[in-house]
Amino acid sequence: ARKCIEEWGADIINDVSEGGITGIANVPLEQRHEEYPEMFRLVGELKVPYILMSVQPTLAGMMKGFAKEVQQLRDLGAKDIILDPGFGFGKNLIQNYQIYNEMEKLNVLELPVLVGISRKSMIYKLLGGDATTSLNGTSVLDTIALMKGAKILRVHDVKEAVEAVRIVDAMMDKD
C-alpha cells in the first residue's frame, strides 16, 4: 500500500482485508491481540482516504467491528474513512441479503458507505444466470443502496448506475 501511494500515485487505499493482510479479518474481534493493525498505522501516517471493508457475516458483528476499527483509525490520525459492508466476502447468500436489508443502520457511524454490488454472485445465484446477465439485479440493488444511505457505488455499468443515482436524487428532491 505504501509503494502504491508514494511511488505509483494511488490516492486511496481500498482494503479488503479489514485492516490486516495477515488474516486479521478472519479472526473474531474478541480474539484480536494486535492493538493497531499495521495497515491502520500506515493509513494514519500517510493521511490517505481509506476504504474499510468488513467480512463479518452479520450486521451486529459488522457494526461492532467497524466501531472498534474506526476508533483505532482515528486514534492514529486517519480522517477520510469509508465503510464497505463487503458484500460477497465472508458471507453466504442469505447473510448478504440480511445485511443489505438493514444496511441503513450503518449510517449511525456517520461515515460514507460504499456499496460494491455490481455483478456479484449474490445477484446471479438468486436470479439464475451469471455476471453478464445480472445488470437488472445490479441496478435494483444500487437503487436500494442509495435509498438506504450509501454515498458511493462501485460499478461496472456506469451509465445504468448514473441513471439510478439520478432517479433516487429526483425522488429525494436533490439537485
Where are these regions (language model features)?
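Active-site-adjacent loop and "lid" segments of alpha/beta metabolic enzymes
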Residues: 1-76, 90-175
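Conserved H-loop
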Residues: 79
